UniProtKB/Swiss-Prot annotation:
Subcellular location, record wording: Virion
Database matches in InterPro entries: PIN-like_dom_sf, XPG-I_dom
Physiological role: Minor structural protein that acts as an endoribonuclease during lytic infection. Degrades host mRNAs in the cytoplasm by cutting them at preferred sites, including some in regions of translation initiation. Together with inhibition of host splicing by ICP27, contributes to an overall decrease in host protein synthesis. Also, after the onset of viral transcription, accelerates the turnover of viral mRNA, thereby facilitating the sequential expression of different classes of viral genes.
First and last residue of the signal peptide: none
Alphabetical keyword list: Decay of host mRNAs by virus, Endonuclease, Eukaryotic host gene expression shutoff by virus, Host gene expression shutoff by virus, Host mRNA suppression by virus, Host-virus interaction, Hydrolase, Inhibition of host innate immune response by virus, Interferon antiviral system evasion, Late protein, Nuclease, RNA-binding, Viral immunoevasion, Virion
SUPFAM superfamilies for the chain: PIN domain-like (SSF88723)
Remaining remarks: Strain 17 is relatively weak regarding early shutoff compared to strain KOS. Strain HSZP protein is non-functional for host protein shutoff.
GO biological process: symbiont-mediated degradation of host mRNA; symbiont-mediated perturbation of host translation; symbiont-mediated suppression of host gene expression; symbiont-mediated suppression of host innate immune response
Similarity annotation: Belongs to the herpesviridae VHS protein family.
Pfam assignment, any one: XPG_I
Spans annotated as Disordered: 110-135, 142-161, 285-319, 332-364
Entry protein name: Virion host shutoff protein
Length: 489
């Protein structure tokens, strides 16, 4: 899932940065967690080590480890579920739904040229009460008999591939335990989880998204790949834009071709293929050093950069990317930079030789960052209340030709959908972006114990996990208090 080849490209070109994400004392860093994606990664990692554990036991083992790390690193997770909190909502928005709807409408490329390129309104763009969040079942409501969110009798190990055992992830069980423990969560309803994560990021609700899906980068988010390491590998969207020397609208319009969910049967392009078609070359080390020096010595000027030339009408095609990127590489255009540099970016964001906690350049266990420095960096990070808002996302449509094929129609619709998720709306003098509702149930440890003992029948295993939850997952703070302290103080 995600952008094909982006993860490999990011590692090869050193765009995966090691950051501490340390918050000042008394603060928690809010982070959106794509629950299925994160738990899938952990279960695949640990289920081989514990072959005797059933689905619920291995899921709870991974969840205990996850919650322990969140507590140790002062991270405040907001869990985003797939297919609603009951795991039964049909997904009618997002990349997969756009592809399915478009291919059902159009049988040939000729038909695609006559179809409206607008996707259906999402729960975020529709001003009416949304049905996507209407089927919330509050914590403690009993499930139908036999409903466990499992694959049923078909979950046996496939005989043809013994090296790849069936995934033992009890997603619904995981959600119910988290709700009983009082953690904040998003009921994505009919949205895909990564779309809900992008909404949390661009509404300045969370500072990062914890996922390995690189399509979040296409939606302009900064992602965390793994929080269990001593350092935390992250990929910042702005780092990629600087490296590619392009604006976000260009990035969205160009790399939508790499989105695997939009292009079935291996019809997607890889990141390397797209860059090769554009004759893009990576910056030399001397260019990188000069860029870092300029960032350290330049004042935070707000003067506007000369805009990129508008796309030609009617005849615009992807071939024009070659000329545009060639001129950018040659210095003809400056890369867009509307907001101040993020102090958590690659250079640390602070002028002068002083080290920063943003990117760890020495072994993590040797890094001792004073709390005063953490507080200064935090205040600098949240100084601009609109730092995550992307105002120019609609310009991506200017870089696309009119859709003439099914593939181009799918890409066009998806970009419009992304704009509806992350692009603010003008309402007179106000700029508005609707945030998905956040829920947080009252912590009920008795209910958590009941859920665990009902699904994990071995008393010793259940008691061990319950003790871990009691000691390693203390009651989380109220999400409104955490967000107000992080963003407003």
């Amino acid at each position: 899932m995600g952008l094909f080849g982006m993860m490999k490209f990011a590692h090869t070109h050193h765009l995966v940065k090691r950051r501490g994400l340390g918050a000042p004392a008394g603060y928690f860093t809010p982070i959106a967690v794509d629950l299925w994606n994160v738990m899938y990664t952990l279960v695949v990692k640990y289920q081989r080590r514990y072959p005797s554990y059933d689905r619920e036991a291995i899921t709870l083992h991974c969840l205990c480890r996850l919650l322990k790390v969140f507590t140790q690193k002062s991270l405040f997770p907001i869990f985003v579920t797939d297919r609603g909190v009951n795991c039964m909502e049909p997904v009618v928005f997002g990349a997969k739904a756009i592809l399915a709807r478009t291919t059902a409408q159009c049988r040939t490329d000729e038909e695609a040229s006559d179809v409206d390129a607008s996707p259906p309104p999402s729960p975020i763009t529709d001003s009416r009460p949304s049905s996507a969040f209407s089927n919330m079942r509050r914590r403690g409501t009993s499930l139908a008999s036999g409903t466990r969110g499992t694959a049923g009798s078909g979950a046996a190990l496939p005989s043809a591939a013994p090296s790849k055992p069936a995934l033992r992830l009890a997603h619904l069980f995981c959600i119910r335990v988290l709700r009983a423990l009082g953690y904040a969560y998003i009921n994505s309803g009919q949205l895909e989880a990564d779309d809900a994560c992008a909404n949390l990021y661009h509404t300045n609700t969370v500072a990062y998204v914890y996922t390995t899906d690189t399509d979040l980068l296409l939606m302009g988010c900064d992602i965390v790949l793994d929080i269990s390491a001593c350092y935390i590998p992250t990929i910042n969207c702005r780092d990629i834009l600087k490296y590619f020397k392009m604006s976000y609208p260009q990035f969205l319009a160009l790399f939508v071709r790499c989105h695997t969910d939009l292009h079935p049967n291996n019809t997607y392009a890889s990141v390397e293929d797209v860059l090769r078609e554009c004759h893009w070359t990576p910056p030399s080390r001397s260019q990188t050093r000069r860029a870092i020096r300029r960032e350290h010595t330049s004042s935070r000027s707000t003067e506007t950069r000369p805009p990129l030339p508008p796309a030609a009408g009617g005849t615009e095609t992807r071939v024009s990317w070659t000329e545009i990127l060639t001129q950018q590489i040659a210095g003809g255009y400056e890369d867009d930079e509307d907001l101040p540099l993020d102090p958590r970016d690659v250079t640390g964001g602070h002028p002068g030789p002083r080290s920063s906690s943003s990117e760890i350049l020495t072994p993590p266990e040797l890094v001792q960052v004073p709390n005063a420095q953490l507080l200064e960096e935090h205040r600098s990070y949240v100084a601009n209340p609109r730092r995550h808002v992307i105002h120019d996302a609609p310009e991506s449509l200017d870089w696309l030709p009119d859709p003439m094929t099914i593939t181009e129609l799918v890409e066009h619709r998806y970009i419009k959908y992304v704009i509806s998720l992350i692009g603010p709306k003008e309402r007179g003098p106000w700029t508005l972006l609707k945030r998905l509702p956040i829920y947080q149930d009252i912590r009920d440890e008795n209910l958590a114990r009941s859920i665990v003992t009902r699904h994990i029948t071995a008393p010793d295993i259940a008691d061990r996990f319950l003790e871990q939850l009691r000691t390693q997952a203390p009651p989380p703070a109220f999400y409104k208090d955490v967000l107000a302290k992080f963003w407003d103080e």
